[in-house]
């Protein structure tokens, strides 16, 4: 296995070209592939011990067996239940329709996942896909991520962080008749329209500039909720990669080897999906 990985790393350009070719074949089979993209990160505990001290109060370690790994936090696990881990994170953009990976990146666990949302979106576009919506959880809720998606003509579908004492100058307007309702969006003007529920107020409607708190697809709408359900696609894909394709537990060390291991697992996923699509077309 070691010799095989060494030879494969030397042929990295050819291996990357193989991944691109498989993705192109899948895009030809599934025209809607990549239209709605779900982005998230998942932990990959290292094949090493990240404790600073050895057991029973021994001396401090001079170096770790996997120096590229680092301590990170599992966002889906409470800290009281052992949310910290030593290793890596795989950041992935997955098609919400086909559950297939479109772009991915392996990094040390200490890096926040929000740093890789826009690079992943750029990688998806570089592979020939045209994402219209980008679905992420509240860990990605930031002005930079929202504005970056809009600049790429991709509607951000991001759950909002409920921060304490947050200023709300552009919140949805309200009146004595209740909270105003969404009445449409102008994508050219980057604004949303809100209307008085009774129609008695003057003016009866107002336009609000779209921003992180008031996106062009408002969180109050049915469409936003339906799109956000697509975020489960990336969670399902992480589960399949770990349980069925051997992404975890790791048996290699070093960022380069771990990234190659992830590439091989994802290549197997894409190749199997392509084989199934071809089998269906031949049977028909």
Task: Identify what each model region corresponds to.
Residues 1-151, 157-161, 263:
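Polybasic low-complexity intrinsically disordered regions
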Residues 4, 15-18, 22, 26, ...:
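Generic structural signal of hydrophobic/aromatic residues within well-ordered alpha-helices
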Residues 20-25, 188, 192, 228-230, ...:
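Charged alpha-helix within mobile-element recombinases
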Residues 69-88, 195, 200-228:
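Alpha-helix-centered segments that form part of catalytic cores
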Residues 93, 208-209, 237-241:
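A glycine-rich, aromatic-flanked flexible loop/lid motif
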Residues 164:
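Positions that flank functional sites
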Residues 167-215:
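Cys/His-rich short segments
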Residues 216-284:
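Basic, amphipathic alpha-helical segments enriched in Lys/Arg and hydrophobic/aromatic residues
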């Amino acid at each position: 296995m070691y010799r095989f990985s060494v030879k494969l790393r030397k042929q990295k350009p050819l291996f990357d070209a193989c991944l691109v070719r498989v993705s192109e074949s899948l895009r030809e089979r599934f025209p809607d592939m990549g239209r709605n993209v779900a982005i998230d990160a998942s932990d990959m505990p290292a094949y090493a011990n990240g404790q600073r001290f050895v057991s029973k109060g021994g001396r401090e370690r001079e170096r770790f067996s996997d120096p590229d790994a680092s301590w990170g936090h599992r966002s889906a696990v409470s800290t009281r239940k052992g949310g910290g881990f030593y290793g890596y994170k795989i950041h992935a953009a997955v098609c919400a329709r086909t559950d297939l990976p479109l772009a991915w990146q392996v990094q040390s666990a200490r890096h926040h996942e929000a740093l890789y949302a826009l690079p992943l979106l750029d990688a998806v576009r570089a592979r020939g896909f045209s994402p219209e919506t980008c679905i992420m959880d509240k860990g990605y809720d930031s002005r930079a991520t929202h504005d970056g998606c809009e600049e790429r003509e991709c509607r951000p579908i991001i759950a909002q962080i409920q921060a304490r004492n947050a200023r709300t100058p552009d919140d949805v307007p309200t009146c004595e008749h209740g909270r105003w309702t969404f009445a449409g969006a102008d994508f050219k003007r980057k604004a949303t329209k809100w209307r008085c529920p009774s129609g008695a107020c003057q003016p009866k409607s107002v336009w609000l500039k779209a921003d992180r708190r008031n996106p062009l697809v408002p969180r109050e709408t049915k469409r936003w909720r339906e799109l956000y359900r697509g975020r489960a696609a990336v969670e399902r894909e992480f589960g399949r990669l770990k349980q069925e394709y051997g992404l975890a537990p790791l048996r290699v060390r070093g960022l380069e080897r771990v990234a190659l291991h992830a590439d091989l697992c994802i290549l197997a996923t894409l190749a199997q999906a392509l084989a199934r699509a071809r089998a269906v077309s031949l049977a028909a």
